[in-house]
């Protein structure tokens, strides 16, 4: 009985360990495949997502240029919550090459660079209507100390091609670094995977070119997908092997003569990155009240002018009758 209990506990412990290991491997593989060239890479490699030139660093990995749009109110009052809607349009029928070489739907991601003092609205300040627009999205700060820079993604593009950010406007009365001015807002949005990793290596979502000119002497299809293309360089007699990852379509065949940098594969990329900007005014409530008072005064003056004119006309009419 003692031996049987020991065996049972040993077997259970081994099964638990095996399950944890498998789960961890699945998580790592899944995370690696979906996070390629998404905001996590920018967060890991750049202190600020916007370079001094105005270029957003996501463009370093997403080489294709695609449109993105942002809608914000023209003006907001201090300590109020407003919507910043980022639109990332694309053809929903398109499929992209995934890291495993298969075809799948496109994901989207975005980075929103707000003026200093503006930040993500706390949940208790977000209205039910705005929460419905946000859906299940989970936003995060680009850095713990950069609350004005928000990132999201990757998320399913078919559901979130429009992303609503709930933003809390600052109050100059409590934040002396903020003033009642017009401020710029910058946005970057991508759909689909990137072509370049931060270390400079290529993903399988881009074109692969020949690293040498010559004759293709052999094309080996690898067991797990992808190809090894052997190029015989006639100029020096050496052989060069180009590795093509899985999921790409070859444009060349054995015996074909090719040139240096000639495309070996078609371009699988159907996504891309775009950036845009908008302006927003942090409006002084006293200025609004003053404007309303001025407009009210103008309206009253017009009314009194009309009444006075009618009174004058009556006096003139009575004098003529007399």
Swiss-Prot record:
Pfam families: Apocytochr_F_C (PF01333), Apocytochr_F_N (PF16639)
Binding-site list for heme: 38, 58, 61-62
Subunit field text: The 4 large subunits of the cytochrome b6-f complex are cytochrome b6, subunit IV (17 kDa polypeptide, petD), cytochrome f and the Rieske protein, while the 4 small subunits are PetG, PetL, PetM and PetN. The complex functions as a dimer.
Membrane topology of the entry: Single-pass membrane protein
Membership in a protein family: Belongs to the cytochrome f family.
Compartment list: Plastid, Chloroplast thylakoid membrane
Organism for this UniProt entry: Aethionema cordifolium
Domain of life of the native organism: Eukaryota
Record-annotated membrane-spanning stretches: 288-308
Required cofactor names: heme
Keyword check for Signal: yes
HAMAP family: Cytb6_f_cytF
Gene Ontology molecular-function annotations: electron transfer activity; heme binding; iron ion binding
Protein name: Cytochrome f
Record keywords, A-Z: Chloroplast, Electron transport, Heme, Iron, Membrane, Metal-binding, Photosynthesis, Plastid, Signal, Thylakoid, Transmembrane, Transmembrane helix, Transport
GO cellular component terms attached to this protein's record: chloroplast thylakoid membrane
Function: Component of the cytochrome b6-f complex, which mediates electron transfer between photosystem II (PSII) and photosystem I (PSI), cyclic electron flow around PSI, and state transitions.
Stretch forming the signal peptide: 1-35
């Amino acid at each position: 009985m003692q031996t049987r209990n020991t065996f049972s506990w040993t077997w259970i412990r081994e099964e638990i360990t095996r399950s944890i290991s498998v789960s961890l491997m699945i998580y790592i593989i899944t995370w690696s495949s979906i996070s390629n060239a998404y905001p996590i890479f920018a967060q890991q490699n750049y202190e600020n997502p916007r370079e001094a030139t105005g270029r957003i660093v996501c463009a370093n990995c997403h080489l294709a240029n695609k449109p993105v749009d942002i809608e914000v109110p023209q003006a907001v009052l201090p300590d109020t919550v407003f919507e910043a809607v980022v639109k990332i349009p694309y053809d929903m029928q398109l499929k992209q090459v995934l890291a495993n070489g298969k075809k799948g739907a496109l994901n989207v991601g975005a980075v929103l660079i707000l003026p200093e003092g503006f930040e993500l609205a706390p949940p208790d300040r977000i209205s039910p209507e705005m929460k419905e627009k946000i859906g299940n999205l989970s936003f995060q700060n680009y850095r713990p100390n950069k609350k004005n820079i928000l990132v999201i993604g990757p998320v399913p593009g078919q559901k979130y091609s429009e992303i609503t950010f709930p933003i809390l406007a600052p109050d100059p009365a409590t934040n002396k670094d903020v003033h009642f001015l017009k401020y710029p807002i910058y946005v970057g949005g991508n759909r689909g995977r990137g072509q370049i990793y931060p270390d400079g290596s290529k993903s399988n979502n881009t074109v692969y070119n020949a690293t040498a000119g010559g004759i293709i002497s052999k094309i080996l299809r690898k067991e797990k997908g992808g190809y090894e293309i052997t190029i015989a360089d006639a100029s020096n007699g050496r052989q060069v092997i180009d590795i093509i990852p899985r999921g790409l379509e070859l444009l060349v065949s054995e015996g074909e003569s090719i040139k240096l940098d000639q495309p070996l594969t078609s371009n699988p990329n159907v996504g891309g990155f775009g950036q845009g900007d908008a302006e927003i005014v942090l409006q002084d409530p006293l200025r609004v009240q003053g404007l309303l008072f001025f407009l009210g005064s103008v309206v009253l003056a017009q009314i009194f002018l009309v009444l006075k004119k009618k009174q004058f006309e009556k006096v003139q009419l009575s004098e003529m009758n007399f």
